Amino acid sequence: MGGTADFVLSITIVLVILIIIAFIWYNFTGWSPFKYSKGNTVTFKTPDESSIAYMRFRNCIFTFTDPKGSLHSIDVTEVLNNMAKGFRDAQNPPSSFTLGGHCQAPLNAFSFVLPGVNDRATVATADDAKKWENCDATLTGLQRII
Protein backbone atom coordinates (compact mmCIF):
# COMPACT_ATOMS: atom_id res chain seq x y z
CA MET A 1 0.00 0.00 0.00
CA GLY A 2 2.90 2.35 0.75
CA GLY A 3 4.25 1.96 -2.80
CA THR A 4 0.95 3.01 -4.37
CA ALA A 5 0.62 6.04 -2.09
CA ASP A 6 4.18 7.10 -2.89
CA PHE A 7 3.50 6.72 -6.62
CA VAL A 8 0.29 8.80 -6.44
CA LEU A 9 2.09 11.45 -4.39
CA SER A 10 4.97 11.66 -6.86
CA ILE A 11 2.58 11.91 -9.85
CA THR A 12 0.66 14.65 -8.05
CA ILE A 13 3.86 16.59 -7.36
CA VAL A 14 4.95 16.28 -11.00
CA LEU A 15 1.53 17.49 -12.22
CA VAL A 16 1.59 20.47 -9.85
CA ILE A 17 5.07 21.40 -11.08
CA LEU A 18 3.93 21.13 -14.73
CA ILE A 19 0.90 23.32 -14.02
CA ILE A 20 3.13 25.93 -12.37
CA ILE A 21 5.51 25.89 -15.34
CA ALA A 22 2.61 26.26 -17.79
CA PHE A 23 1.20 29.15 -15.76
CA ILE A 24 4.56 30.94 -15.73
CA TRP A 25 5.08 30.31 -19.45
CA TYR A 26 1.66 31.68 -20.41
CA ASN A 27 1.73 34.73 -18.16
CA PHE A 28 5.35 35.83 -18.41
CA THR A 29 6.69 34.85 -21.84
CA GLY A 30 5.77 35.66 -25.41
CA TRP A 31 3.76 38.86 -24.85
CA SER A 32 4.67 41.65 -27.28
CA PRO A 33 3.71 45.25 -26.55
CA PHE A 34 1.90 47.36 -29.14
CA LYS A 35 0.93 51.01 -29.33
CA TYR A 36 -1.16 52.80 -31.92
CA SER A 37 -1.79 56.54 -31.97
CA LYS A 38 -4.42 58.72 -33.58
CA GLY A 39 -4.35 58.36 -37.36
CA ASN A 40 -2.71 54.90 -37.38
CA THR A 41 -4.51 52.03 -39.07
CA VAL A 42 -4.76 49.38 -36.36
CA THR A 43 -3.87 45.99 -37.85
CA PHE A 44 -3.01 42.90 -35.84
CA LYS A 45 -1.06 40.26 -37.79
CA THR A 46 0.34 36.91 -36.79
CA PRO A 47 4.10 36.66 -37.37
CA ASP A 48 3.97 33.21 -38.96
CA GLU A 49 0.80 33.48 -41.09
CA SER A 50 -1.12 31.30 -38.62
CA SER A 51 -4.79 31.98 -37.89
CA ILE A 52 -5.62 35.23 -36.14
CA ALA A 53 -8.03 33.16 -34.01
CA TYR A 54 -5.01 32.12 -31.93
CA MET A 55 -4.01 35.69 -31.07
CA ARG A 56 -4.73 36.86 -27.54
CA PHE A 57 -4.60 40.30 -26.01
CA ARG A 58 -3.85 41.55 -22.52
CA ASN A 59 -4.00 44.90 -20.71
CA CYS A 60 -5.40 46.70 -23.77
CA ILE A 61 -6.34 50.27 -22.96
CA PHE A 62 -7.99 52.73 -25.36
CA THR A 63 -7.37 56.29 -24.17
CA PHE A 64 -8.83 59.41 -25.73
CA THR A 65 -9.52 63.05 -24.95
CA ASP A 66 -12.85 64.74 -25.50
CA PRO A 67 -13.27 68.24 -26.98
CA LYS A 68 -13.17 69.70 -23.45
CA GLY A 69 -9.73 68.16 -22.87
CA SER A 70 -10.90 65.49 -20.41
CA LEU A 71 -9.02 62.19 -20.59
CA HIS A 72 -11.03 58.94 -20.82
CA SER A 73 -9.82 55.32 -20.78
CA ILE A 74 -11.52 52.04 -21.61
CA ASP A 75 -10.19 48.53 -21.11
CA VAL A 76 -10.79 46.89 -24.51
CA THR A 77 -8.97 43.62 -23.84
CA GLU A 78 -12.15 41.55 -23.94
CA VAL A 79 -13.33 43.26 -27.13
CA LEU A 80 -10.07 42.49 -28.97
CA ASN A 81 -9.96 38.90 -27.68
CA ASN A 82 -13.53 38.32 -28.83
CA MET A 83 -12.75 39.80 -32.25
CA ALA A 84 -9.85 37.36 -32.66
CA LYS A 85 -11.82 34.40 -31.30
CA GLY A 86 -14.60 35.20 -33.76
CA PHE A 87 -12.40 33.82 -36.55
CA ARG A 88 -12.24 30.34 -34.96
CA ASP A 89 -15.07 28.92 -37.03
CA ALA A 90 -14.12 30.64 -40.28
CA GLN A 91 -13.46 28.33 -43.22
CA ASN A 92 -10.21 30.10 -44.15
CA PRO A 93 -9.31 32.21 -41.12
CA PRO A 94 -7.09 35.19 -41.96
CA SER A 95 -3.68 35.85 -40.45
CA SER A 96 -4.59 39.47 -39.64
CA PHE A 97 -7.49 41.76 -38.86
CA THR A 98 -7.93 45.51 -38.98
CA LEU A 99 -10.07 47.61 -36.67
CA GLY A 100 -12.86 49.09 -38.74
CA GLY A 101 -12.99 46.03 -41.00
CA HIS A 102 -12.83 46.73 -44.71
CA CYS A 103 -13.12 50.47 -44.05
CA GLN A 104 -9.73 50.43 -42.33
CA ALA A 105 -10.60 53.59 -40.42
CA PRO A 106 -7.59 55.14 -38.69
CA LEU A 107 -7.57 55.18 -34.90
CA ASN A 108 -9.65 58.06 -33.57
CA ALA A 109 -11.77 59.04 -30.58
CA PHE A 110 -14.66 56.93 -31.93
CA SER A 111 -12.73 53.67 -32.46
CA PHE A 112 -14.26 52.32 -29.24
CA VAL A 113 -17.35 53.73 -27.55
CA LEU A 114 -17.66 54.85 -23.95
CA PRO A 115 -21.40 55.32 -23.31
CA GLY A 116 -22.27 58.86 -22.31
CA VAL A 117 -19.00 60.28 -23.66
CA ASN A 118 -18.44 59.47 -27.34
CA ASP A 119 -21.55 57.48 -28.26
CA ARG A 120 -24.11 58.36 -30.93
CA ALA A 121 -26.58 59.88 -28.45
CA THR A 122 -23.95 62.19 -26.95
CA VAL A 123 -22.37 63.22 -30.25
CA ALA A 124 -25.68 63.88 -31.96
CA THR A 125 -24.87 66.41 -34.69
CA ALA A 126 -22.23 66.96 -37.35
CA ASP A 127 -21.07 70.03 -35.42
CA ASP A 128 -20.56 67.88 -32.33
CA ALA A 129 -18.62 65.31 -34.37
CA LYS A 130 -16.45 68.02 -35.94
CA LYS A 131 -15.31 69.10 -32.46
CA TRP A 132 -13.86 65.61 -31.96
CA GLU A 133 -11.56 65.73 -35.04
CA ASN A 134 -8.54 67.02 -33.13
CA CYS A 135 -9.02 64.79 -30.09
CA ASP A 136 -6.10 62.51 -29.33
CA ALA A 137 -6.49 58.71 -29.13
CA THR A 138 -4.13 55.84 -28.30
CA LEU A 139 -4.44 52.07 -28.05
CA THR A 140 -1.83 50.18 -26.03
CA GLY A 141 -1.52 46.63 -24.76
CA LEU A 142 0.13 43.25 -25.15
CA GLN A 143 -0.46 40.55 -27.77
CA ARG A 144 0.68 36.98 -28.33
CA ILE A 145 -0.10 33.84 -30.28
CA ILE A 146 -1.22 30.87 -28.19
UniProtKB/Swiss-Prot annotation:
Top-level taxon of the source organism: Viruses
Gene Ontology CC: host cell membrane; membrane; virion component
Alphabetically ordered keywords of this record: Host membrane, Membrane, Transmembrane, Transmembrane helix, Virion
Membrane topology: Single-pass membrane protein
UniProt-recorded name of the protein: Uncharacterized protein E146L
Regulation: induction: Expressed in the late phase of the viral replicative cycle.
Family membership: Belongs to the asfivirus E146L family.
Compartments (UniProt record): Host membrane; Virion
UniProt keyword annotation of Transport present: no
Transmembrane feature ranges: 7-27
Coiled coil: none
